[in-house]
A protein has these predicted regions:
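Helix-to-loop junction immediately C-terminal to a conserved catalytic motif
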Residues: 52
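Conserved ABC ATPase "signature" region
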Residues: 99, 103, 109-124
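Catalytic Walker B motif of ABC-type/P-loop ATPase nucleotide-binding domains
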Residues: 153-157
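H-loop (His-switch) and adjacent beta-strand-loop-beta switch element
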Residues: 201-213
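Helical segment within the ABC ATPase nucleotide-binding domain
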Residues: 167-180
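Conserved ABC transporter NBD signature motif
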Residues: 60-75
């Protein structure tokens, strides 16, 4: 096993003349839940897309289990990915969507039922995806991310569209995954919710402002992740 589940080393990404992220470096330990935080336009989605090979960095590299995403023999076994804004084919059922994902991942036939149960969609498996609420679609995205039984999850705004019960469910889901030895890198604006579940945080605003343990950032009961986050991002110029 490589030392880190995820490692980002000096990643810079430009889109033409626009600098999206600048010399980002951080590592995500095995068995941890790490929150990736930053204001809109800070480069969170760019960073996640670079890690999973959807974007090529201008310089630097990103590794999963010590290798670039493109070098993983069967990526779905190593990492499950759920990105905000990635849609589904609305005319097919949830089960069919997961069957397609299962075939692509080379997962056993029974895996679809397992992930449907894990995300609470068993009773809705035969519904067409276009009838799903935003929260149900989020759960379906998580189910697809789990289909290959990966050791690592990379999630972009998984709480979007979830009601309070759904957010509580998501918190439990992430904890259970980590307790089984899994690793999670999650980008979210839900700071209060993240504070209850993450072990470490990475705050970026095109570059890394903080990367480390939550307890090293929030050092007293009088502080919160939200207050320390705003101290960091409002104290920088871009």
């Amino acid at each position: 096993m490589h030392k880190h589940a995820i490692e980002v080393r000096g990643v810079t990404k430009r889109f033409g003349g626009r600098l999206a992220v600048d010399d980002l470096s951080f590592a995500v330990p095995h068995g941890s839940i790490v929150g990736l935080l930053g204001p809109n336009g800070a480069g969170k989605s760019t960073t996640l897309r670079t890690i999973v090979g959807l974007l090529a960095p201008t310089s630097g590299d990103a590794l999963i289990d010590g290798r670039p995403f493109a070098a993983l023999e069967n990526p779905a076994v190593h990492v499950g990915v759920h990105m905000d804004g990635f849609g589904f084919e609305g005319a097919i059922t949830a089960r069919r969507h997961l069957e397609i994902s299962r075939l692509a991942a080379g997962a056993p036939r029974g895996r679809v039922d397992e992930v449907l149960d894990e995300v609470g969609l068993t009773d809705d498996a035969r519904r067409r995806v276009k009838t799903f609420s935003t929260g149900m679609a989020q759960r379906l995205g998580l189910a697809a991310a789990l289909i290959g039984s990966p050791r690592t999850l990379i999630l972009d705004e998984p709480a979007n569209g979830l009601d309070p019960d759904g957010i509580r469910w998501l918190r439990g889901f992430l904890r259970r995954f980590a307790e089984r030895g899994g690793t999670v890198l999650v980008a979210s604006h839900q700071l209060a919710e993240l504070e209850q579940v993450v072990d470490q945080v990475i705050v970026i605003k095109r570059r890394v402002l903080f990367a480390g343990r939550l307890q090293d950032l929030v050092t007293s009961d009088a502080e919160s992740l939200e207050s320390k986050y705003f101290d960091l991002v409002e104290g920088t110029q871009t």
